[in-house]
Amino acid sequence: MPAAAQPRRNRFIRTLAVAATGAAVLALPVLGATTASAATPAVSTATSLGYANNLDGWIRASLQVMGQHGIPGTYNGIYRNVIRESSGNPNAINLWDSNAAAGIPSKGLLQVIDPTFRAYHVNGTSWDSYDPVANITAACNYAAARYGSIDNVFGAY
């Protein structure tokens, strides 16, 4: 190929590469949504399990999921810890302790940090650590592994 044609050919190849990349980027959300929707299992929430969307319903829904997975705990044990940790606020976040200083603040009803939430997440619940049922269930799973049950937790854990 003559030297004069080389820059024009390189420009054409770069243009094709950019166009192909752009097309792929535009197609990803459509392809991903189709694939993800087909593979996404149903998530248990208080309302999907027939309970009210409040603290009582969240605890009862969590107990139902916990029962299905053999995670011990009682209504009173969960309630006591929720009130101490977040006063029942599912959006509570601790921005002042050592976890927060390390960039992983405690979140949700039972003030779980993200690494613990991910490690003790229970299938069938949301992966959102602020989701009340997912937060309670993961925290109870952690408490069961560490203390035998959430019922045995009487302070920060």
Where are these regions (language model features)?
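Peptidoglycan cell-wall recognition and remodeling modules
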Residues: 53-157
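N-terminal prepro-regions of secreted/extracellular proteins
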Residues: 1-52
